[in-house]
């Protein structure tokens, strides 16, 4: 019997779950120094940039029916793609640990039973999500996401329309607009190496990809607003204290736990999918469970309070990688390079993009550093390919 494809609705639901997360709310709190107006502009611009990149990446996988790391083989070759598969698994293990740590820390701030207890509870729930499986998550996710959305709306109302707010924050110059844009791009960018793992199974590739990106972007913007609003109007940056200050007890706890589970499930699941790209002997589901266990143990053992450098490392690796894929697939329309071991030209172009990203980290631009890096990398990729084609014709 032919495997059932995922609907536009279920794809949208998956990415709704990705957007409703502690990571988005916590990142939103960083925007408070800009003041409300400039912070919102940076959030919107960053998500526009990140959303367009997500759509391009998701469409490649949706049209080719390939996972994210399988699409990487198309541009970098069978062996060349292993570098990105390994790096992707490592970043997903990192994200799994960070999300479980953040969720456990925040949950313990509401109900003091020990961070390690909450880490185990969250890890166990993620394993349940993995066992249920992507195509069978429809009803379970619908219930969980509807509840989370209602609770998020209540939290939004309390923060923005409640009484006893702190004095509004004005721009104090501690965060530049360009740096804020980069913080807004950071979350969509972190999903770039993952989105095709879900769009590849879509019944309607274009509609499912568009729905995934739009739903994620809108929900992520909303979550950023909650974090930013909490920091500006309540003067609080700690998620547990935000919940308590706004009058949430068990309700806040449910938001914390289930948003962490639904988001971290995507990280663990995609780590399993990427592991198959490294070795076909690996089973997706069991690899995802192993990643969840490792992430849970790491969340118990290691403190993970500052992830700025981790985000920049993700950007420097995957922004130029996706840029090369976009140039290859949409502009040059090159033949699939999967049969070759290495696609050396593209690997060199990626390295140029990687170095450029690290350099741009020290330059303040109005649009952050991801967009300039990707635009330049795309241009370099096209120029190199045109030169190579001209030389070959002679």
Residue locations for each model-derived region?
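Membrane-interface loop-to-helix entry segments
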Residues: 117-122, 126-159, 171-172, 209-216, ...
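Hydrophobic transmembrane alpha-helices that form the core helical bundles
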Residues: 81-113, 261-277
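C-terminal membrane-solvent junction of multi-pass transporters and transport-like membrane proteins
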Residues: 172, 323-394
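Transmembrane alpha-helical segments of multi-pass small-molecule transport proteins
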Residues: 14-18, 84-89, 110-132, 146-156, ...
């Amino acid at each position: 019997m032919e495997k059932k494809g995922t609907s536009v609705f279920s794809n949208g639901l998956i990415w709704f779950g990705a957007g409703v997360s502690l990571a988005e709310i916590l990142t939103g709190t960083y925007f408070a120094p800009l003041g409300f107006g400039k912070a919102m502009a940076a959030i919107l611009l960053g998500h526009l940039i990140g959303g367009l990149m997500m759509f391009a990446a998701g469409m490649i996988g949706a049209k080719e029916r390939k996972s994210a790391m399988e699409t990487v083989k198309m541009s970098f070759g069978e062996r060349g793609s292993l570098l990105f598969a390994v790096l992707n698994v490592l970043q997903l293990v990192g994200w799994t640990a960070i999300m479980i740590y953040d969720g456990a820390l925040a949950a313990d701030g509401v109900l003091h039973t020990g961070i390690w207890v909450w880490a185990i509870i969250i890890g166990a729930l993620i394993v349940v999500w993995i066992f249920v499986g992507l195509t069978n998550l429809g009803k379970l996710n619908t219930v969980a996401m509807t509840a989370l959305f209602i609770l998020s709306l209540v939290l939004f109302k309390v923060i923005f329309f409640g009484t006893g707010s702190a004095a509004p924050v004005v721009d104090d110059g501690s965060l530049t607009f360009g740096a804020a844009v980069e913080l807004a791009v950071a979350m969509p960018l972190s999903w770039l190496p993952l989105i095709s793992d879900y769009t590849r199974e879509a019944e309607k590739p274009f509609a499912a990809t568009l729905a995934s990106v739009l739903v994620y972007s809108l929900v992520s913007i909303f979550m950023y607003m909650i974090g930013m609003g909490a920091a500006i109007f309540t003067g609080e940056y700690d998620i547990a204290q935000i919940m308590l200050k706004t009058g949430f007890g068990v309700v806040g706890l449910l938001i914390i736990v289930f948003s962490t589970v639904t988001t971290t499930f995507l990280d663990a699941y995609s780590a399993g999918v990427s592991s198959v790209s490294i070795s076909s002997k690996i089973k997706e589901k069991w690899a995802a469970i192993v990643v969840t266990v490792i992430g849970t143990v790491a969340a118990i053992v290691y403190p993970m309070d500052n992830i700025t450098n981790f985000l920049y490392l993700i950007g420097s690796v995957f922004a130029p990688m996706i840029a090369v894929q976009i140039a290859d697939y949409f502009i040059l329309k090159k033949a699939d390079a999967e049969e070759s071991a290495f696609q050396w030209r593209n690997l060199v172009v990626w390295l140029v993009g990687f170095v450029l990203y690290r350099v741009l980290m020290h330059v303040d631009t109005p649009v952050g550093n991801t967009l300039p890096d990707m635009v330049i990398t795309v241009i370099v990729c096209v120029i190199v390919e045109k030169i190579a084609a001209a030389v070959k014709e002679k």
